[in-house]
């Protein structure tokens, strides 16, 4: 595989994602990753994020978390606020609220635009409420 091929697959994946064609996008991102030279870390990170987004859109939350973790692991210093926000959303979807709150909080530190930051604050508040309710339910089920 070449960098040009991988870029082509990545761009196709983005277009398919924007059209709501998540399965096709997923396939394109996987082809981009498969053929991408290991030295092209930035493209690999972006393609893993794309995979995460496509998986999230398909309701495949645990798999999306793995994709986001892979992206972060490739280049921890360059992690965007949006990646952390998306991973937080995946954690919230599987009711792992403490992990979601950590991701949302870190995403604020990594830079989000104003509307994203406001949404992030709302998500943190929502997850805190849900985490408390979850803890109460678990405490009741133990008795």
Identify the meaning behind each predicted range.
Residues 106-143:
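Terminal, low-structured helical/coil segments at or just beyond the last alpha-helical repeat
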């Amino acid at each position: 595989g070449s960098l040009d091929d991988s870029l082509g697959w990545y761009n196709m994946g983005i277009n398919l994602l924007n059209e709501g064609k998540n399965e096709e996008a997923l396939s394109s991102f996987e082809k981009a990753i498969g053929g991408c030279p290991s030295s092209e870390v930035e493209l690999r990170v972006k393609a893993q994020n794309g995979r995460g987004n496509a998986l999230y859109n398909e309701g495949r939350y645990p798999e999306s978390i793995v994709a986001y973790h892979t992206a972060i692991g490739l280049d921890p210093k360059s992690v965007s606020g949006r990646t952390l926000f998306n991973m937080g959303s995946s954690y919230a979807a599987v009711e792992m609220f403490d992990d979601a709150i950590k991701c949302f909080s870190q995403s604020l530190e990594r830079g989000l635009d104003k509307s994203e930051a406001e949404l992030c604050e709302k998500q943190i508040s929502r997850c805190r409420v849900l985490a408390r309710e979850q803890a109460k339910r678990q405490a009741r089920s133990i008795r």
